[in-house]
């Protein structure tokens, strides 16, 4: 629980499961300095919490994910104390992602920050008995750039969910679109989620600007983040007729609105050398929605989407190609076919049961 909520650390019982709700510093929706300090203090807070609340508990398996990479000492403490096995779910490769975006330098005085976090990253890999990556491209990147990692401990263990059926009537879809002024007679492309540096917002703006002549499509951008202000300035200045920007919505309204759209959008900055694999993909697939991904060339999310025949991909530097794919996806029959493929692919590859079986096979 972040400090801003003013809730003390507490241990709760949820149907027999003991959950420790630690009070930590503010990490989300704050400035970089506060976020950095809060992230650095995480492992000491976790370690103290484990010692205080779980001193008599013996753990057999520790599951942990990135971000953040600053839990190494807490994981190592349990591993040594309880002789526990450790499994890292590698959802983000830091600090290289920050280097790619120019946020951290590898040379000069500023390289000290990089060296600190790189050491943390190496230590996290070292204490991990197994490493589950989001995709094959992640495995290739990790092995190529970390000679100390043995390929026998690394495998694909992708993001996953427990799929639910999305049941929204045509009346509800029409009602929610009318409530927020979203056209009911156009193909609506939605981006929902973080609006930060990793998303390459400048390219998103370029796509909206260059697609204004398409009378069949409409862009709905819903989210928050460090780049929201840049988008807001663009919308206030240009007032694009083919797009809408929304910040925060009531949870139920967002769920209905998002699932009343036609195509899910994924954006990644073209400068990335690490193969990101955004979890946003899964919510689109759950809604039987085709996906248009515009990313760097190093991620394999585009290959997964196109091989599964549930969407299209283009590089996040080619607005003309992006807009040609937008035109293709204005075909209702194509969207219906791809949407069905998306849901099927999700159920066959990205369920919580699949992830469980990948992890637990090591401990049977």
Each model region followed by its residue ranges:
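Conserved donor-binding/catalytic core segment of Leloir-type glycosyltransferases
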Residues: 183-199, 205-208
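Nucleotide-activated donor-binding/catalytic signature segment of Leloir-type glycosyltransferases, i.e.
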Residues: 216, 220-223, 228-255
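Acceptor-binding helix/loop patch of EC 2.4 sugar-transfer enzymes
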Residues: 27-34, 57, 82-119, 164
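Membrane-proximal helix-turn-helix segments that form the acceptor-binding/catalytic region
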Residues: 73, 77-81, 111-133
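Carbohydrate-associated surface elements
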Residues: 137, 157-160
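A short helix/loop element that forms part of the nucleotide-sugar donor recognition site in Leloir-type
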Residues: 6-10, 167-182
